[in-house]
Amino acid sequence: MIINSPIGSAPTSEPDVTIVTDSSITTHKNPLFVPDANAEYVFELAPAVKIFRLGKSIPVKFASRYYDAITLIARVMPVIDGKPVRNGSAIYTAYDSAIVRGEWIEDLTKQTLEVTLGEQKMEINIADLRIDETISMLSKYFSMKIGDIVSPCYLPLSTTPVIDTRITASLSGCNVINIKVK
């Protein structure tokens, strides 16, 4: 489940959520095949956490008990009229390899994370991700299941995937995404 809002935004009572199918997610170990259907795509980073407990209607104060790892995901989105398409028809959000999931990091003790995408860098405060608030809000509408991936926001780091190049991203010095674009 992906929340379509920038970092630091508070979850709303009617969230803009994108549900992604398992077949749309590829791992950092597989190459990224850019679809032929559109001329331009953008590769945008977002933090994500892995749910490891079953839950419904989770209060904010208990939400941290439901996730045990963090990573970066990369959304590969078509660009239409100069803007990435973050939601809408499944043709834009649910095609094969629409999401590249990075390697999981189980150390959740850091308060600040450094994110890099190629030469771009930024530091994010864990509190700005609003993970607990997002899980609490989503659990009112959806059951949280073991293995679910929740992305609370997107980051202002993006690049254009170019065929026959590599895209790398790291989280606090750990290389979590290193993929070949085909």
Give the ranges of each region predicted by the language model:
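Catalytic-core "active-site belt" of small-molecule-metabolizing enzymes
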Residues: 1-143, 157-182
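Glycine-rich beta-strand-to-loop/alpha-helix junction loops that act as flexible
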Residues: 146-156
